[in-house]
Design a protein with these regions (language model features):
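Loop/turn positions that initiate beta-strands
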Residues: 9-14
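A broad, low-specificity signal marking well-ordered, structured residues that form hydrophobic/aromatic
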Residues: 15, 52, 70, 85-86
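Short, charged beta-turn/beta-strand-edge "cap" motif at the junction between a beta-strand
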Residues: 20-25
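C-terminal terminal-subdomain/extension
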Residues: 7, 72-138
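Compact nucleic-acid interaction/catalytic patches
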Residues: 26-76
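Short, surface-exposed secondary-structure edge patches
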Residues: 2-8
């Protein structure tokens, strides 16, 4: 049974979340049901908007190599008790009430792999530019 958390999610936390498929008549690629999620939105957004951006983990074997799927062994990340894959292209927005209390958190070393995969998924994050409309992550 899923129990919603009362604390405001913080970036880097791993929380279980419940996502329902509101468009149940359509075939979607959203991860529905209860899954562990990595919180990736900033703390100010999480606090003021009542929602946060998350990336789902799955324990299913994905098969072929994909640069935006990051595999973690059980225990490699505090809070993951099974081998898991972080699915970068599954990034979604959930309401804070759809997330449990934190079950783990990412370290600096874990973030490096996520940032590199995000650059592959969103190539505009790699561009060096003086244009203020382009976001640069170095």
């Amino acid at each position: 049974m899923f129990v919603a958390g009362k604390s405001i999610p913080k970036i880097g936390e791993i929380r279980f979340g419940y996502a329902s498929d509101d468009e149940s008549r359509l075939i979607t690629h959203k991860y529905v049901g209860v899954h562990p999620y990595l919180v990736v939105s900033n703390n100010t957004y999480n606090k003021t908007s009542g929602q946060c951006e998350v990336i789902p983990f799955t324990t299913k074997r994905i098969g072929k190599y994909n640069p935006v799927h990051i595999e973690y062994k059980a225990g490699e990340v505090r809070g993951l008790i099974k081998d898991s894959t972080l699915i970068i292209e599954g990034r979604d927005t959930l309401r804070n009430c759809q997330l449990s209390e934190p079950v783990g958190e990412f370290t600096e070393g874990n973030w490096e792999r996520v940032v590199e995969a995000m650059k592959v998924q969103c190539p505009f994050l790699r561009k060096e530019s003086t244009d203020s409309t382009v976001l640069t992550i170095a």
